[in-house]
Structure formats: C-alpha cells, structure tokens
Amino acid sequence: MPIKRFFNPSEPGRPQRAAEMLRFALVGTAAVLIQYAIYALLVCAIDHNLAMSVGYGVSFVFNFLASTRFTFRVERTMKRGAGFALSHTVNWLLQLAVLNLFLRLGLSKTLAPLPMFAICVPVNFVMVRFFLKQNGVRIFALFQLRREEFAPVALFSGLLLLLHALLIARYWTLFTPLRAEYGTIFIRHFHLSGFDPITYSVISEWSAGYNVYRHPLLAFLVYPLSLLNQGLMQLTGINCAVFLTAALLLFCALYSFVFLHRLLRDVLSLRLADARLLSAFFFSLAYVLLSAIAPDHFLLSLFLLLLTLYLSGLYLRQRAPLPTVTTLLLFILTAGVSLNNGLKVFLAALFTRGRGFFRPHFLLLAVLLPAALLWQFSRFEYRQFVWAGEVARHEARAKQKAVRQRQLPTLQRQSPPPKTAPKMGMPMMQGEFMRWTDMSTPRLSSTVENLFGESFQLHRDHLLEDLFGTRPVIVPYRCVVNYVVEALLVLLFLAGVVCGRYNRLLQLALSFALLDWALHLGLGFGLNEVYIMTVHWAYVVPLALACLFMRLRGGSLRLLRVLVLLLTIWLYGWNLSALVSYLLPA
C-alpha cells in the first residue's frame, strides 16, 4: 500500500490506519527504550555490536508480542512469526551498519544509537506491516520446496557437500587456526583458478575487502556471518569462516538449482524429466560447478540473477509489469553484489513493463534514484573504509622499493627486467573503469578456449591454475573430443535460440548474456580470465535447449534427450574427475 494513502482524508479506512500508526509509535517507543537501556548498561563492559545485539534480542521478543496483539491485532502464526523475524533480522543488520557508520563519523557510543533509531524505526514499520498485514509471508513460498524437487535437490546437495568437504579438508590446517591477521594467509595459499578467497577474509575479520565500486554492498551482506564467526571462534577455538562460507554457498547453489528448475517447469511448461535433465546439465558446466564451492561472489550473483529471471518470467507469463518495489529490491541486492548485474534487473523491468518502463515515476524511483544512491554510497564507502588503507599500502610499497633500489648494485639497477609473456591486455584508455578494458587479447582464441571452452570443460593442462600465476591466457585441449563436445554444445545452443527466438523469457535471458559478452568480448573487461564469470550468463544455454525441447516431437525429441543426457554425463565425468584430483592431496 503506498505511504500517501495513510494521509489521504478521502481514503477509506484512514482512521483505522491512523490508530495503527499511533499504536506502532507507542510499542516502537517502548521497544526502543528497552533496547537502548540494555545497550547503555552493557556497552561499558562488552563490544558495542554485541551490546546492541543483546538489547535488540530482548526488545524483539517484546515487539513481536505487542505488535501482533496490540499494534496490528493479527493472529500469531508460524509464517507471520517467520516474516516478523526476517524483517527484524534485516533491521538488526541495518542498525549495526548505521551504528558503526555514525561511530566512524565521530559520534560517541552513547549518542550514535539516536540517529540510528531515527533511520531504522520507520524502515522497520514498513517491513513489519508488510509481513503482518499485507500477506507478505507469501514471499516464503519462493523458498518452500515442492514434492517434485525433493529428489534432485537431495542428490545435488550430496554432491555439493562432498566437494565442499574436499575443499575444506585441503585447506584445514592453514585456514582454521586463529590468527592476528587472516587476509595474507588466504590470498597467499588459496588457489582455485582465478577465484579470490575474499569472503574467507571478510568473514574472519570484517572489512570492506571487496572492490567497493564493483561490489558495493557485498561486505555488508556477509557482515552477519562475520559476527557469527566471532562468536564461534570464542566457542570452538578455531576460525569457522570456511564452514560459514560453505553454508552460504550451499544455500545459494541449491536455490539456484530450484529457480532454474521452476523456470523450466512454471514458465516454459517443460515436462518434469526434461526440467530435471536440463537443471542437472547446467551444473555439469565446469565453472558453474566450480562457482558452487569457490569462496567468491559469483554464486550469490547466480542466485539473484535466476531469482530475477524467475520472477520476471512469471510476470511475463501473466502479462503483468514487474512492480516498482520488486524492481527496486532486486536492483539493490543484485547490483550490491556485482554492480554490472544491476543493469540486468533494469532489462527485466523493461521486458515486463514495456513503454511503462519510461514513465517518469518508475524511471525516477526504480532506476535513476537507486542507481545514483548506490554509486554515491560506493564513493562514500571508499572514502570511509578503503582510502586510508590504500594510502598506507602505497607508502609502504614506495619505502620498500626505495630500500631495494639502494641495495641493488648500479649495473643490476640499470639492467632491463626479464621478459615475461604479457597476460594483462592493453587497455583502451586509462580511468577508474576503463583501465580494466583490453584491446589486445585475441578474441577468437579466447572464445574457443575460454568463453565456450574452459567455461564448460576444464583444461587438463594448467588445471585450475591462476592466470596471475603460471597459467597462460590461452590453453588448448589435448584431445579433439573436447572440441567436438564444445561444438555440439554451441550448435545445440544456437538451434535453441532459433527455435525460441519469439519466446520472451529466452529473449530476456539472451539480453543478459549479450550484455556480458559485450563487456567481455567487446570492451575486454576480464577477457583474459572470462571463464570465471560463466555463471553470469550460462543459464541461457539450458533455457535455449528448453526451447529446442519444446519445438521437437517424436523421434527427434527422443534423440535430443539422449544427446543432452550423454553430454551431461560426459561433462560431469570430465569436470568432476579433474576437480576431485585437484582437491585431493598429492
């Protein structure tokens, strides 16, 4: 319900809503006083985050009882309780973030909660009312497994648990001991292709460790796991970051599987057996499977992109526009994890809304305003959390370089550096983002060996080596069979695109993929290791194959099923054997 309806005199039910707001103000004031009193008592003895969390927990219990019985006067149910807990979890995270922000800006621990409450309490009112009065509990239906999903999800869970166990065992002795500093250990010793273990570092000891311009909200989204890890460290005596990261990735992987399966079933109306086959096929692709265990941001992006596609597909099927609030929330989450993927949410809104996308109120509230605010937040985050550390690191490096230069003999200092094969392409121009472009890396060989090669089938030579280590930019396959499989996959994909060229869902997914291909192959962003971005676009392959399944009949369809099944078996066999051999100790 729009907020303006609360204040419209001609709106029916206005007195009831006014009374509701008054009751909320009374209950909210009492809850705030309880929380602040407990915080003020504890903050002198324990960490301010823990003190605020204890106070919030006590006020939460009071708030739930008072909100259901007095404020909104609704029946207490399990679903409403879950929705209430979810809204308060979001509000708790927001409170911690705002509290630490004002502390960093110079306010005392006594005064910082006051502006925090001023910001967070109105947000909490909107969320609580949504879950208790507007049937917002329906959102949980998205995460409720259906009977037909139990078996494939259980099998997929078993596979992922095994792979996570192998990865954790590989780094157990290095990553679980408690240390004074964690980042260096993770960066120096973790090796899994080009994936970065930044999530391990941020959960072990929170910082804005990700690139704040490309991942502006990601560090804050994993902040609760960092707090939980601090408590587990005290209880267990080990760093549990590897387990918490695995749990997060497992959740995202399972629901990515579920959302893809539902896209095939609910939106494309595929048969159950075909939907299961194509869902399994998707996760047989090398860097989709690898992203499911890599402690990086890619699987979170896949989860959010498939959620965006699923919701958009449902609205396309109903010929309804993607709501403004839904667009706003999807953009904040998706762009907050990876900024360029936020453009895909706007594409989804454009496909579902058509010309309505350009209406001033939608363009302002759902596109321009959130994009501007997120960009400004990125710049603020850089100034507050990153800039001072970067200056200190640059100064330290300059001092070390000066010391080394003084120690080197004159002739050695004047000799040219040894020649090495260049791995970073020549940028189109210098700048905050354009310095990441690449106009010199060959496009054709990158497409064959990396974009549709390594992304789908791991190379045995230089297996899972890092480009910034010993891996060349271009690695050929040893066996012609790999090129045959790659050609089959590309041909089937193109055939599916032709068959589904009028399908709105496939058109939307293709627009997502084309955006990535334009960035990688056109501008050269990340072209030298384009395979690690596979999950940002590879879902278009099973969706195109689904359109091919829908077009064929009789013997042709049976032949296609057998071919896709054989390709899936080959990909799992090829990629899992390589991955397991890499993870097992030598």
Question: How would you describe each model-predicted region?
Answer:
Residues 50, 111-112, 260-284, 507, ...:
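Transmembrane-helix signature of polytopic, membrane-embedded enzymes
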Residues 142-143, 342-371, 385-399:
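Perimembrane helix-loop-helix junctions
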Residues 146-194, 201-206, 368-383, 568-574:
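Transmembrane signal-anchor helices characteristic of membrane glycosylation enzymes that use polyprenol
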Residues 197-243, 413-495, 506-509:
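Lumenal/periplasmic acceptor-binding loop at the mouth of the active site in multi-pass
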Residues 247-268, 491-495:
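Transmembrane-helix motifs of polytopic, lipid-linked glycan transferases
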Residues 293-297:
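Short acidic/glycine- and proline-prone juxtamembrane loop motifs at membrane-interface regions
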Residues 300-317, 544:
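Specific aromatic-rich, kink-prone transmembrane helix
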Residues 322-339, 345-353, 365-370, 566-567:
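Membrane-interface alpha helices of multi-pass inner-membrane proteins
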